[in-house]
Amino acid sequence: MSGSQNDDRRQFLLERLLDAVKQCQIRFGGRKEIASDSDSRVTCLCAQFEAVLQHGMKRSRGLALTAAAIKQAAGFTSKTETEPVFWVYVKEVLNKHELQRFYSLHHITSDAGRGRAWLRCALNEHSLERYLHMLLADRARLSTFYEDWSFVMDEERSSMLPTMAAGLNSILFAINIDNKDLNGQSKFAPTVSDLLKESTQNVTSLLKESTQGMSSLLREITASSAVSILIKPEQETDPLPVISKNVHVDTRCKRERRRRKKVTNIVSFDDDEEEQGTGDTLKKMPGTAESSEENSDRSSVNIMAAFEGTFGPNSNGSQSSSSWKIDSASLNGELGYQKLDVKSIDDDVDENEEDAYRSPLGRGHTGHAESPDRTLDGNACLAQVHGWAPLQVLHGDADADTDVLFPVSGVGSYGAADAPVGSLENGTGTENHIIPEPGLRYREASSPGQGSPLSSLLPSASVPESMTVHELRQAIVAMMNRKDELEEENGSLRNLLDGEMEHSAALRQEVDALRRKVTEQQERHATKVQALARENEVLKVQLKKYVGAVQMLKREGQTAEAVPSLWNVDAEVTVPEQKPGEVAEELASSYERKLIEVAEMHGELIEFNERLHRALVAKEALVSQMRQELIDLRGPVPGDLSQTSEDQSLSDFEISNRALINVWIPSVFLRGKAANAFHVYQVYIRIKDDEWNVYRRYTEFRALHHQLQSAFPQVRAYSFPPKKAIGNKDAKFVEERRKQLQSYLRSVMNKVIQMVPEFAANPKKETLVQLVPFFVDITPPGEPLNKSSRPKAVSRFPKLSRGHPREVRNVEPQSGDL
């Protein structure tokens, strides 16, 4: 494989594994439900981990030959494991006790099974992440077991394995690790033909049991799935197993009569018959089979394939013959499987049945007898009738009366597609379609001693001979797993499609945004081009004016050349130093040069003006920003500095005559209890190096506002926060009111500075307190005055006043408190 194909394969494995992990997390993540191997998502997850760990394993020919020799010497006839398995590398990182644990499993006999058991055990114990870190840590050891193009050798992708394993720790796994199904081939891509071929290896061991074991086995088959054992498929294609969804066990089967039992002969087939061809004969069990200890007589066990419904006998003991009918179809467009009934019948009924089913032929009992037809119940549905073939009766001994019925014809003798469509569309149809006669006949096979040809009983070498119930279950489970994998793959493809559609929608939105951006740029460029075109037109007009002036000068020079020359009074001819035409030409050329220079200077002035304009705009923005920062940091200044003045000279005058008076309201305190609680605002005033604090309520601010309104009508234009009766204790509201009161006090201070020039020239605390008593700093009794004179009075808020002499200058409030 090429490098691109290997990379595509690794990416495919990664996407499948990510999808399997995602499906398990969606289904079981964060829940208390246990994830067992009966769920297809868990099976798919294990299969994907196996595929990743199996990818790129190096083949060791010597080890494979050694293992094959050992198995051949031990007498195993199963196929030798030639494919390398990841267990050979996993066991390198396991300790002695862990190895002993997996080698001591009863049903695990192969390295592939141990690897799968280890994987499921790691998922159960949430130790897969730790094991994966150990497996991927040693790169040198990895290179000895894996190819360079394998998945685990890809550092970028293999590094995601522990992360995915860690994501599974939230799921409670309960997977069976000691399961003989783990010994088989890989379960992520099974085929029915492989499972059927492997099933022939266990036929002999399953059929070679005692009479009681056979009876119990038949009863177990009846109670679980009631599936007939295929002996000879007539077609070469892999037969599709058909298993009923519901099992109907007749209550008469449970009332087994224990008076006497008939000896049951079991026909067994060795594994060699697949290789020997059709010339060999069937092997049979000895006719002297063990009978029950408590019963001396013999009973027969008949395995009959039948559809769901009651098979009632007539009054004389024989079963009535009726036609097989198709009366209903399955729901939701899915054909159902018919139910089978395996019954153990007494010897008295068996004698009547033997008369009806058999006729003597020579030494053996071979012949044909038509089986009684059964009418299909109205609630049953027919699906793939070709899966149930005519049954064949095998006789093991001439003396034995035990008959076992097996299906003879292969799959496909009567297909579901052959049935009329009208009978399958609903369950209440009135049409009855009869199954062809050859599909309902039973044949009796003579014993091998009678020279019956093997070709009439055995299939070709390429088709499996028989299947046990467990193998049929395994085949169905494999097909269901494959179906789940295909559905999950379809879901992942749909998810990828949805992702691509979302990506495409995002790209469309991005393209639309780019188109809008390009359109805006084109509009801006068009506007700029129009402005340049207008400027060009203006320049053209100016140039025309300049050219007209130059032409006018030229015309004036030409008229000057027509003036006659001057003569002296003495009639002497005076030779002028220079002709007037030449003077006019020089004058015109000088004017032209001057005009050109003026035009150049005009262009330079325009460009210089544009530069000055841009610089002025930038400076104005910077000055406005710095002015706002100055107001925030240093407080108000004389004049309304917060408002941008168009008169630059006025602003310069205000800045040069600035009085150092600053006002802040840095904080608010809540005083009182319960319903009597109120807020107190801290007012901080600084005049040059003198600073003090005043604590006032909102009512005092409001009283000050009313006093100033009566004295100065201009104060009405100032923004004062209104009174609010409900919600005035909210922190956000109090903060907003603090900012508004601070702005109001600064406006009042600016007004005082403008109205009282003496105070602006020499600002002092005493002067401000006389002008505005609102700023009086009231000290509690007994407190000594500091350097600045303060009147002695009782403080209205003793807990907020200073309890010790204040320093000359306190720390200035931070900008964050403003």
Swiss-Prot record:
Residues 659-782 form the PX domain. Residues 467-547 form a coiled coil. CDD domains: PX_RUN, RUN_SNX29. The keyword Phosphoprotein applies. SUPFAM superfamilies: PX domain (SSF64268), RUN domain-like (SSF140741). The modification Phosphoserine is found at residues 268, 291-292, 330, 344, 447, 452, 642, 645, 649. The modification Phosphothreonine is found at residue 644. One of its GO terms (molecular function) is phosphatidylinositol binding. Keywords: Coiled coil, Phosphoprotein. Transmembrane segments: none annotated. It comes from the Eukaryota. Residues 267-299, 343-375, 441-462, 781-818 are annotated as: Disordered. Pfam families: PX, RUN. Residues 36-180 form the RUN domain. The keyword Ribonucleoprotein does not apply. Residues 445-462 have a biased composition (Low complexity). Belongs to the sorting nexin family. This is Sorting nexin-29. It comes from Mus musculus.
